[in-house]
């Protein structure tokens, strides 16, 4: 049986992991065994946080909208109910941007929601 030489494959695999671990602290960027664990953990965090990012942004948008509509004398839930009744289809991302940067336009939208609710 012929001798199997696999140094090239092992080197390639190690280099790939160490390249992914570049910039990590201490042994996590230098020692293959530790680097491999660090890269796997980083991947798990990245996967989890890609999903959490969507939740966090939605929560941020809702907080901004809530702050803006309370300045105009309406709660968040009442505003959303009013917008649905008035068939104004603006998503929360755009609403929050208006609440922060275009206060007059946001106030006009809140007034329309108030008018439908009254």
Curated annotation (Swiss-Prot):
GO biological process: ribosomal large subunit assembly; translation
Keywords: Ribonucleoprotein, Ribosomal protein, RNA-binding, rRNA-binding
Gene Ontology cellular component list: ribonucleoprotein complex; ribosome
Superkingdom, natural source: Bacteria
Cited CDD domains: Ribosomal_L20 (cd07026)
GO molecular function list: rRNA binding; structural constituent of ribosome
InterPro entries: Ribosomal_bL20 (IPR005813), RIBOSOMAL_L20_CS (IPR049946), Ribosomal_protein_bL20_C (IPR035566)
Entry function: Binds directly to 23S ribosomal RNA and is necessary for the in vitro assembly process of the 50S ribosomal subunit. It is not involved in the protein synthesizing functions of that subunit.
Similarity comment text for this entry: Belongs to the bacterial ribosomal protein bL20 family.
Name this polypeptide is given: Large ribosomal subunit protein bL20
Organism placement in taxonomy: Bacteria, Pseudomonadati, Pseudomonadota, Gammaproteobacteria, Pseudomonadales
Gene: rplT
């Amino acid at each position: 049986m012929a001798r199997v030489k696999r140094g090239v494959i092992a080197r390639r695999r190690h280099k790939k992991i160490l390249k992914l671990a570049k910039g990590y602290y201490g042994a996590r960027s230098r020692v293959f065994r530790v680097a491999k664990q660090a890269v796997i953990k980083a991947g798990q965090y990245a996967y989890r946080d890609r999903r959490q990012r969507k939740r966090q942004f939605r929560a941020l948008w809702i907080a901004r909208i809530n702050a803006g509509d309370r300045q105009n004398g309406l709660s968040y839930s009442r505003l959303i109910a009013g917008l649905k009744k008035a068939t104004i289809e603006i998503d929360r991302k755009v609403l929050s941007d208006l609440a922060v940067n275009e206060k007059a336009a946001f106030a006009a939208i809140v007034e329309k929601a108030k008018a439908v609710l009254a």
